[in-house]
Structure formats: structure tokens, C-alpha cells
Amino acid sequence: MGLSPILNFDSTSVQENIELPKETLHEDEFWQVVRSHYNLHPDFINLESGYYNITPKPTLSKYFKHLERVNLEGSFYMRYNRFEDKNIITAQLASFTGCDSKSLVITRNTTESLDLIISGYPWKKGDHAIHALQDYGAMQDMFEQIAKRYKVAVTKVSVPNHPIDDEEIVSLYESQITSKTRMIMVCHMINITGQILPIRKICAMAHRYGVEVLVDGAHCIGHFDFSIEELNCDYYGSSLHKWLATPLGAGLLYVKPEHIPKIWPLLADEEQDPSKIKRLSHTGTHPVATDITIVDALEYLSWMGIERKEKRLRFLKEYWQNALKNQENILINTPFERHRSCGIGNVGLKNISPSKMAQLLYEKYGIFTVAIDYANVHGCRITPNVFTTTSELDVFIDAVKSLSKLSI
């Protein structure tokens, strides 16, 4: 139609905006430069990057340009450029996450992705599903709904905060499987503790029983390095506005090709070929500039390096975790083994409730966290980010030590 797809609108790459030869920078210098890419609130130390990762300025500037272009073209873009752009974006995202683009669709968040599967699965009366008490509430709610709607039995397990080994976790789920079990939902990373579960082993076990595995990877894409297909799960959902740091409202859903035909979409699509995954992602008109910016977020992460980011996030978590372990009245609710967590952790106090702890951290020390007080997890989730400094964590460490000595 004469106008090129929007992805070609701005020829300036993220790398050209940043102009940083990372190989010539000392590690501390590199992370100071990364910190400069963020507009940070001056009134508090942000240790709650779990809900939403704020978008770095290089990505944000591209997002604003995409908004301007979509607004300029209006309906022309929506009718003639949107679909080609979506294909390009999906292909790049699939390449990064390690799966075929024909098995991936862009959604708005993890809840949408996983609930599409839970609600769209062809349940029958008497079927059985398993998930954990530590799973995200929205998905637990959806399992409760299908239990009522289709008379499905649902069993909840409780994942230990400090497992002895992988086999303890695998056996926990295996012990609840029956001849009626159709699906296990499991967190790749438990959102309230940061614990990374042995997904490949869980999938291998479940598949021996003919049970499918739905993986909640809300906190994993852009957080640490892995391939979705190598997990051998049946379904995988994630939020891209978390650790990939896209603007709010971007997620993904992966479905193994053989399962696509049996899943009913939430909203009907004109695509009638049951083997096409695109039929699962119809939502009507939505903010397309967010989708477009996924490419820019991928470019920014490519500049940073996923291995380098993973190493930094794990370093930050271990920095405060090791400083607070074996301290009186302090409870660490996240495993210490390096492969069992990355950037997210959880710490509690025996002498103070989680809600009071979060309140005092904010009011007395200017530290923003979130209280967790359920499912055998009692503490504050601590989620630093690539912009977090060790000096900020020192403030947090000193604050927790001080609070552990209070009598309330």
C-alpha cells in the first residue's frame, strides 16, 4: 500500500542510541551506565521489580516513537501494516525464547496466557489437575472456576522453601497423580520466593503418566537464560513487561504443536484452521505500540547480554541473602543453592509480621518491597534490578538487621 511496516520507521538502533562498547567497560562502570538508562524515583529505593520492571529510557523512547507512528497512520496501520509487523515481532521473540514461531503467540500477560489454556482445555467431568499453594492467585482462581464448571478435581501441593534436592520436588507432584490426572501447573520460578523449579524433570515425570504440564514462567523471560523447547513442557506463559522490561501489557504463550487443535480460544477468531496458534490470541483492538516495542526490548537485552544480566541479578540477590543468613530472628525463604534462584528472594522476621516489616522498611528507611504472608511464605519479597546498586542493598541489609532487634 505504499508505506513500509512500522518496524522500519526508526532506523536508529538501540545500540546507536547507547553507544557503549561493553567489552571495554569495567563491570561496575557498565552497571552504572545501565542505571543511567532508568528514570528512578528519588523518594524510595525500589526493591519491588517483580510486579513490573520499569522500562529503560532507550526502549521507552522507541515506544513513544511507535505511538506517534501508529497515531499518524491510524487505521491505515491497523489494516495494512499491523499483521506483517506482528509476524516479524513473533519470529524475533520465538528466536530469543527458543521455540518455533508457529508455536508462539503474543498476549497481554501471563494470566491471560495461562488462563487461555486452563479455560480452553477440553475438560471432562471427573478429570483431575494439580497445582501448588504457592502458585499465582489468578491461575488458582481459574482452576477453581473449571472445578465448578466442569466438575474437575483439583489437588494443591505445598512446595518447600528449601528442598533437599530436585527429586523432592518431582516426587511431591508425582505423589498426587491419579489415573484421572490430565494436567499439572507448575511455576518455573515461584513468584513469592524466587525459587526456580526443575521443570525438565517434572515434565519428564509427568509425561510418563500421560499428564500435560502447564508452566507459569511469568518471571523468567529476560531474567535468566533458557530455551522453552528444551524444557519439554506442553504449555508456557510469561509476562514480557517483567524481566524483558517492555511497556505494560505484553506477554507470550507457547503451545506444543500437537496440543494447539484441542484448545478452545477465549474469544473466537476468523482463523478456522485448528492447527494455527493465532486463533488462540484474538482479543480485538489493543495497544499495538506495546507489541512493536518488544523488538526494542529484545535489542536492549541483546546489548546487555542475557548471561551478563543473569549473573548480575544473581549476584545482587546473593549479596543481601548471604549478609542476612544465620542472623537471629531473620528467616530466608529462598534456597541458597545458586541454580535454585536468580534475582528474586524473600526474607522474613520472626519478631515482626510481613506487613509490618514492609511498612517499616518504607516509612523508616525509604525501601519499597511487598509483604507475602501465605502458603508457608512469611516475609517480604526482595526484587532488585539491573539498576540496583550494592550501596542501596547495604541500606536494606542494615535496615533488616535493625528491625530484627525490635520488640513489637
PLM segments and residue spans:
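Pyridoxal 5′-phosphate
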Residues: 2-408
